[in-house]
Amino acid sequence: MPLLISPFAELDLIRQPEQQDEPLQAFDAADEYLLNHVAQAGLSLPSRVLVLNDSFGALAASLAPHATVISSTDSFLAAQALEKNLARNGMSYDAVPHIPASEALQGPFDWVLIRVPKTLALLEEQLIRLQGQLAPGARVIAAAMVKHLPRSAGDLLEEYVGPVQASLAVKKARLLFATPQPMEVRTSPYPTRYRLEEPAIELLNHANVFCRDGLDIGTRAFLPHLPKNLGTARVADLGCGNGVLAIASALDNPQAHYTLVDESFMAVKSAAENWRATLGDRDVRVRAGDGLEMQEPDSLDVVLCNPPFHQQQVVGDFLAWRMFLQARAALVTGGALYIVGNRHLGYHTKLSRLFRGVEQVAATPKFVILKARK
């Protein structure tokens, strides 16, 4: 893989999760453009730099020796990548503190460097949280590849920070410079809420939760076919989002024990709040993590999963395949993985390579619900 070469450092970076023969690099031209601009503008200690949505630590690791850097993302994998890439390049793994996007930031910040996220609601929430956190004369710069930079990103910067100037495009990347202005403090429109009829529950969704304004159609297809009569089974909701699958299952299985895991900190916070609102103090484990990577082998009886098919702007089934491998390792012999997926993704064939028995539980014109037994 090529090195990230900037005026600050030459770094050997890896993506998370790691893949054998990884076809993609852990930085892009927008990272390079932003680092070159910051170097030209002049960055030095004791500047406090906030880096938002740095997917694999390219920005934070480059700047760490030259300023006090704080990173904030909504991704457990991004936090893990930052630690690994710092250590990989001769720095302490904790040289840059990471603040989950679900938690408050503590300014003041002299620089705010933003990689524009795929979900603009996350950007809006982050900009709202910046209110009162900028030092006098602070610089706020957002970066993105042009193909992933909607006009509305600039509109949000202007609404919550101040006037925006766009750079020329360089290597298909662009920077947006926002000049902070005194503004009336705004309240956040997040979290949002919606109600389900079956089961009859209300779900809260923080800004970066998938389908935060309503139930996604895959989950809607899955809900009527969740397993029942689980007794005291140990159940995991893998990639739990707002927790709806686990909560619906728990309502039907009052003695089962649940673990909810997602790599989004905002999803985990949403799931924990939804569980408490619906099920009170019933015992549960809700955690951010790299799927079931840290789950003890042979420690689960059932896994529920609506697998993602993209990581940021990268589309593919590599995350789903990884989840299937993790589920197989965590399940006891005879345990079962239940999934929903688009018909065209061919999950039945993929699961048949890993599990001794795969059956179709139900189907709609667009989705299949599958049960794979270890």
From Swiss-Prot:
Group of enzyme by EC: transferase
Keyword Oxidoreductase found: no
UniProt-listed InterPro entries: DNA_methylase_N6_adenine_CS (IPR002052), rRNA_m2G-MeTrfase_RlmG (IPR017237), RsmC/RlmG (IPR046977), SAM-dependent_MTases_sf (IPR029063), Small_mtfrase_dom (IPR007848)
A cellular component annotation (GO) from this entry: cytoplasm
The protein's Enzyme Commission number: 2.1.1.174
Catalysed reactions listed for this entry: guanosine(1835) in 23S rRNA + S-adenosyl-L-methionine = N(2)-methylguanosine(1835) in 23S rRNA + S-adenosyl-L-homocysteine + H(+)
Any Pfam family matching the protein: MTS
Protein's cellular compartments: Cytoplasm
Entry superkingdom: Bacteria
Sorted UniProt keywords: Cytoplasm, Methyltransferase, rRNA processing, S-adenosyl-L-methionine, Transferase
GO terms for MF: 23S rRNA (guanine(1835)-N(2))-methyltransferase activity; nucleic acid binding
CDD domains: AdoMet_MTases (cd02440)
UniProt record similarity statement: Belongs to the methyltransferase superfamily. RlmG family.
Biological role: Specifically methylates the guanine in position 1835 (m2G1835) of 23S rRNA.
Protein known as: Ribosomal RNA large subunit methyltransferase G
Gene it is expressed from: rlmG
